[in-house]
Amino acid sequence: MVDEATKKTLAAIPLLKTKAGPRDGKDWVDRLKEEYTSLIKYVSNNKEADNDWFRLESNKEGTRWFGKCWYIHNLLKYEFDVEFDIPITYPTTAPEIALPELDGKTAKMYRGGKICMTDHFKPLWGRNVPRFGIAHAMALGLGPWLAVEIPDLIEKGLIKHKDKSESSR
């Protein structure tokens, strides 16, 4: 089900070891260190491959994540806010990644702009607890979702490039 390029990307993202969620005190701090290490490596790999497509940061507790993601289509950059909370049952439960400004624009999205990752991503996540983390959610969840949905939304006219929408006023 996973293509060779995705397998290569995944192999380069460090796996996590600590099975801890936000209520697990010191273990959660250890898990957060692993999460940051994994994310930094994934972003670094993306930059080296000229495939840089998101920035994330978290609140002090590491329970709320936010940032930007972008998708290049026909040489135009489409940028979106991205956000998610770490579930109390994390890492058993994957985070639900949201792109709030796209809420209601596609059937592959839940209320609040949460992207649909049920069919393909969640079973894979479940088989890889606690080894998968936020970087894996981005690589296997948001990345493929953007690649499928954004061109379709642009084609249907539901998303307009910011420069084009400003010049048409």
Curated annotation (Swiss-Prot):
Physiological role: E2-like enzyme which forms an intermediate with UFM1 via a thioester linkage.
Protein family membership: Belongs to the ubiquitin-conjugating enzyme family. UFC1 subfamily.
Pfam family, one: UFC1
Protein source organism: Nematostella vectensis (Starlet sea anemone)
GO terms under biological process: protein ufmylation; response to endoplasmic reticulum stress; reticulophagy
Keyword terms of this UniProt record: Ubl conjugation pathway
GO molecular-function term, one example from the UniProt record: UFM1 transferase activity
InterPro entries documented for this protein: UBQ-conjugating_enzyme/RWD, Ufc1
Residue ranges that the Swiss-Prot or TrEMBL entry lists as coiled coil: none
Name of the protein in question: Ubiquitin-fold modifier-conjugating enzyme 1
Domain of life: Eukaryota
Active site: 116
Stored PANTHER family: UBIQUITIN-FOLD MODIFIER-CONJUGATING ENZYME 1
